[in-house]
Amino acid sequence: MIHNDTVADAKANPDLEQPYHELGLKDDEYARIKELLGRRPTDAELAMYSVMWSEHCSYKSSKTHLRYFGETTTEEMKSKMLAGIGENAGVIDIGDGHAVTFKVESHNHPSYVEPYQGAATGVGGIVRDIMAMGARPVAVMDQLRFGPADLPDTQRVLPGVVAGVGGYGNSLGLPNIGGETVFDATYAGNPLVNALCVGTLKTEDLKLAFASGKGNRVILFGSRTGLDGIGGVSVLASDTFEEGAERKLPAVQVGDPFAEKVLIECCLDLYRANVVVGIQDLGGAGLSCATAELASAGDGGMHINLDNVHLRAEGMTAAEILSSESQERMCAVVEPENVDAFMEICRKWDVLASDIGCVTDGEHLVIEHCGEIVVDASAHTMAEEGPVYERPYERPAEQDELNEPRGVELPETSQEVRQQILDLAASPALCSREFITEQYDRYVRGNTVAAKDADAGVLRIDEETGRGIAVSTDASGRYARLDPRTGAQLALAEAYRNVSVTGATPVAVSNCLNFGSPEDPGVMWQFREAVHGLADGCKEMGIPVTGGNVSFYNQTGDTAILPTPVIAVLGTIDDCARRIPQQLPKQAGAEAGADESQEQYHLVLVGAETREELGGSIWQQVVHDELAGLPPQVDLSVEQRLGAFITDQRDKIVAAHDLSEGGLSQAVVELAIQSGRGMAVNPMLSQHESAVAQGRTLAQQAAVGLFSETASRVLLAVRSEDYGDLMRDLAETGLTGGWIGLTGVSDAAGQPVIRFGSGVYPVLPFGGEIELDPAKQHDDDFDIVISLDEAETAWKSTLPALFSHAAGNNSVI
């Protein structure tokens, strides 16, 4: 027999000791709950308040800083925003009746405990957020962070996470169109699994999360409610992983992607039938969150009967039903006259649905179970009146030492530079992610235009017009550790640039802010700086933050992760047929591996002048195993002008690739390998005077040109006949740019090679032929040659060697 702690019991036994500490509540928070209720809470009320007031649900440590996004968002920035911060996901009007919704969410802590299910349900949760906006989910992306690649625990976690992301997304029929995978010691024991979903809808189909209209019915539909995931996200995300703590953690949710696939189609049918007043997905905090948020956002209260909830387990108490985080569930508000039609559509899709209550007068959420009242509280106090902490923040004492300029030991010889190019390409930081991305279906549904080896994923959303979107997610914890404000703006700049190089126009931003414990003043300083940097950057660029997520307590014991603000940028493109590819085109009839039979192109570096900016760089990490100095400067006005120039010139640009981690060296290596073409590049050209210091050897100067990570730079491939016009147009923008190399370079045997040399100059004036000037070649020049085969082997071999035999999918419990 089920025994619930009822409201009557709470009044009759006011001094009953309750385990509020175990549920993550502090003494003052528990006292505040009793003050709001005028009595002690019931077990069910205590469960609801504990999850709704958790860090994950209430944003109690971050809310005071997140308000800055609203303060810096202008009316012009809001003009195309149909839904923003506070909704399940942001929605942007992109014209012609089309809208796009997108959001990034974290599922970090569950993915360490149970990598496969943690990652899978992270994808499922963000997909349901998109569904709840009235949209069809059309693509996913993932931002992953792990400990060192050769660490045994990484070899347990990574395969499970990748299998979970791929298994769930592939089963849903959603293409995975991009992301990032990063390795760093601070993520050992606390991986980051951030998932993005993007959806499309007609503007008139937008749905919001609110319960409105007295007498309207509340319908729970989808999978049954079970014991899996009780307290999962909401409690896990409010604690740190100390040694041995994983044994105490509650179960991670278990996902069923095929149930979610049916749920997607069911929801879309319900929207088409116009039988939904408001809708909310059940994610973190389960039915507690869905009912409290729906009621709080609406114009009334709510009466719920838990006896009508379809259960997977017998004997579940009210607190367990309300706290369950079982997946693939939604909660809708429906007018009484539409209930039959709603249920009929659910039966059509074989989706369980039950009428669990109604919208009432007032603001109270009343919940009954087994004929007894177990919850009687203001929904607003649960959803909106949680504690808001003004956590102390302070610049860490070690920050000055961390930022001190360090003398960099540059390579002395050409051979050292050559080896470092290969070392960077082969490093876990920069090597090919093909081992991971090949486990994802990138082209399901047939609308993926770019995903493999692309700076941004490009998706067609209208087959008649070719209209499309481009999405990129970026972050650099290394930059943010050195300067969180600049680090956040560099992530924004790179995501913006990645979208721009496809020929798309950036229009909106989402974010997922991953940090250590908010109880550490140094972490809160990092967080505040990153938020202000991102908000100020978005205001300067005129693109709004439409929503996001905060994940705190990402640390193992006292060791916090690198501050990791993940930034997603959404762009629109009027015709996907005109998008700019990242690879050179394959020429019909050209022989594989023979560059002489391929059309040649000029390589042009445009944007900012290359400066000596090696602080926080991948070169510093791989060659010197160090994190020190200052990150690159960022000028967002240059980024905007660069993006506008590329979009304007897209018909003259054959291929474009942004320069970011690894600098010019990695950009050329990737472009050459992905295009299957040889290339010759002069790293001395287009450098700022700071990068060509007096007294340095040619090898040292070349190293700065190759490995510096100066922001706002893009490598373009241009036909000879378009070069002059493009350069004249570039001069009018005030941007720096110039010839830096050419494609179609091979060795004496005709095999493609990558050549970096100070003697690489074109024959002038530019004519129909693209060739190097032999008069510029000297014996004492800096000159190195790497065969394309050698570069490709270095770039592609690392992850398979590390992970192809890893066990994966293992739980620590």
Swiss-Prot record:
UniProt subcellular location: Cytoplasm
Pathway given in the UniProt record: Purine metabolism; IMP biosynthesis via de novo pathway; 5-amino-1-(5-phospho-D-ribosyl)imidazole from N(2)-formyl-N(1)-(5-phospho-D-ribosyl)glycinamide: step 1/2
Gene that produces this protein: purL
This protein's name: Phosphoribosylformylglycinamidine synthase subunit PurL
Species, as recorded: Corynebacterium jeikeium (strain K411)
Residues at the catalytic site: H56, H107
GO CC annotations on file: cytoplasm
Superkingdom of the source species: Bacteria
EC numbers for this chain: 6.3.5.3
Residues that bind ATP: Y59, K103, N511, G548
Record: residues binding Mg(2+) 2: D129, D281
